[in-house]
């Protein structure tokens, strides 16, 4: 059952980066998976180019982050050694602040250096005729990105884990046919065999530390 799978594999791999659980899952699924390399299928595709963009937090954002670090240290000191979820929650909050402080503070009236940098990348790419897949782990971040794309007049679709399968298929078809320039996708929803051949740029807004999940 799914609960057993979550306990044995999904939670240890996704939340705890358990290499042993990942190895066991690979052993179980290996005989049923045929992996084809890009070079074996489409030889005319250019090689993948990866660019890492490091963004400095603005002053307000940095102050909020440092305050969260102080709070995190206090919580971790009080946590029990076996309480892995406490560590995970602390790291997650720091990641959210880096993405956009509004993910943790509803009354935030400052900006987000990362969001601004992402929008610069997206608008420049769209103006250059590119199509983009934009991934985030946080659905609330996708909502903020969608709002900014609307303000910038950039056409886009959004796919989340709650999106029904028939709707997913229709969104994929419409994106591949050129009806939108950007496809916003939650990281977990993206791992469902989507065939998005129209995009030539992929942006991971908040890269996940577990490469297998990403």
Predicted feature locations:
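Conserved Helicase C-terminal RecA-like lobe
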Residues: 43-67, 79-194, 198
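Short, polar/flexible loop-turn hinges at active-site or ligand-entry regions and domain interfaces
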Residues: 12-19, 73-81, 105
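Short conserved active-site loop signatures built around small residues
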Residues: 202
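A short linear boundary/processing microfeature
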Residues: 8-11, 71, 151
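AAA+ P-loop ATPase catalytic core
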Residues: 25, 32, 36, 68, ...
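Conserved SF2 helicase motif VI
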Residues: 211-214
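Conserved P-loop NTPase motor "coupling/switch" region that bridges the ATPase
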Residues: 1-40
């Amino acid at each position: 059952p799914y609960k057993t799978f979550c306990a044995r594999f999904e939670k240890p791999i996704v939340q705890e980066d358990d290499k042993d659980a990942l190895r066991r899952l690979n052993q179980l699924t290996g005989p049923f998976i045929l992996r084809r390399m890009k070079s074996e299928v489409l030889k005319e595709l250019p090689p993948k180019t990866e660019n890492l963009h490091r963004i400095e937090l603005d002053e307000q954002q940095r102050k909020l982050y440092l305050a969260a670090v102080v709070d995190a240290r206090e919580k971790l000191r009080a946590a029990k050694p076996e309480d892995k979820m406490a560590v995970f929650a602390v790291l997650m909050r720091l990641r959210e602040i880096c993405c956009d402080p509004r993910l943790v503070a509803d009354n935030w009236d400052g900006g987000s250096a990362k969001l601004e940098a992402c929008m610069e990348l997206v608008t420049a790419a769209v103006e250059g005729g590119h199509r983009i897949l934009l991934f985030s782990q946080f659905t609330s971040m996708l909502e903020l990105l969608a709002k900014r794309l609307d303000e910038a007049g950039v056409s886009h679709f959004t796919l989340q884990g709650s999106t029904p399968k028939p709707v997913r298929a229709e969104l994929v078809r419409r994106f591949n046919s050129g009806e939108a320039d950007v496809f916003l996708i939650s990281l977990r929803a993206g791992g469902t065999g989507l065939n998005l051949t129209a995009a030539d740029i992929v942006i991971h807004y908040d890269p996940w530390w577990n490469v297998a999940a990403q």
